[in-house]
Amino acid sequence: MSKERTGERKVEIQVASDSPVSLAQLEGKDVVVFDDMVRTGSTIVKCCQALKQGKPRRVLFCVSHFYSSEEGRENMAAGVIDEILTLNTLPTILNRDTQGRLRKKMVVLKIEKWISRHLRSYFGHPSGALAENFYAVDMSSKNPRWKGARG
């Protein structure tokens, strides 16, 4: 996707001219969008709206640092984003009350365990026994996401 800022809070999104994939090729597929940080969610919502024109099965948004404002949480609660995958790099991400309705579509990965595993491997230590629920933090067991896709 190609992004052009037309103002402080205005963004135009379109398929990049050099993209090897057209919107039509997305039909029935899972689409994953990556970003480093989200605040207001305006850009990612516009991007996902454009992608939804291709009729994908679902759109998954992966973001390293989920630091969203109230406006951002409202924007991303819309139906254009089916699931949000993020890391626990910011303490507020684990506060269910702060995330509101988004927790129904959110998966949080524990980055400290990934770092620990890499460092243990790097320094030649065996991985040893680790917690069974190694990567995910269940934001809401009452609202499981994508049961069919997760097995």
Features from the language model and the residues they span:
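PRPP-associated nucleotide enzymes
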Residues: 1-151
